[in-house]
Amino acid sequence: LKLERGARTALFAPSGYGKTTLAMLLAGYLQPTAGEVLLDGAPLPKTGVCPVQLICQHPEKAINPRWRLARVLEESGALSDSVLDAFGIERAWLTRYPRELSGGELQRFCVARALMSGAQYLICDEISTMLDVITQAQIWNTVLAEAEKRNMAILAVTHNRNLAERIADEIVDLAKIS
C-alpha cells in the first residue's frame, strides 16, 4: 500500500479482515513482523509528533479520562480557533472532562487533535461508524476540506462501501487481496 500526499484512499473490507491492524502498523502503533513501513523512504520517527496520525473508532479509548479537553488538544500544539470552529467545538467544552461529552463530541476532539498536530497523513479508522448522519457528514466534510487545504493524504478505513466511494479517489479492497 502506497499513500501519496493529497491522495484520498479507502481501505475497505468486512469486519475481521485486519483493517485496524494494518492501520495501527501504518501509524507506528504496532511493529511489522515482516516488511516495513516507510515515510519518504525512512522509518517513522520515534520522537516528536509523528507526521502520520491515527484516529480510532472509539474516541473514549484515545483520550486520557483524567485530562480536561483543552489539555487533550494541547498535546498536539497550540489550539487552533479555525479547527475548533470547523468542527463545531464549543469553547465551554475545553474545561470539561471526556466523560461529560457525547461520543460524537469526543470524536470531534480526536480529529481536531490530529489535524492540529500538523499531520501529513491521516488514518481514519471507522471514525464515523457510531455517529448520527449529521455528525458523520460534518466530520467528513471538514476532514476532506482540511486535507485539501494542506495537501494531506487520507486513508479511510471502513467496512461501508458507500462511504468509501463517496470520500476516496481509490479503494483498496482487502477482501480481494487477502
Ranges and model annotations:
Residues 27:
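Helix-to-loop junction immediately C-terminal to a conserved catalytic motif
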Residues 35-48, 176:
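Conserved ABC transporter NBD signature motif
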Residues 58, 65-79:
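Q-loop/switch helix immediately C-terminal to the Walker
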Residues 97-101, 105:
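Conserved ABC ATPase signature
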Residues 111, 123, 139:
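Hydrophobic anchor residue at the start of the ABC signature
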Residues 137-150:
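Helical segment within the ABC ATPase nucleotide-binding domain
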Residues 157-159:
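H-loop/switch region of ABC-family ATPase nucleotide-binding domains
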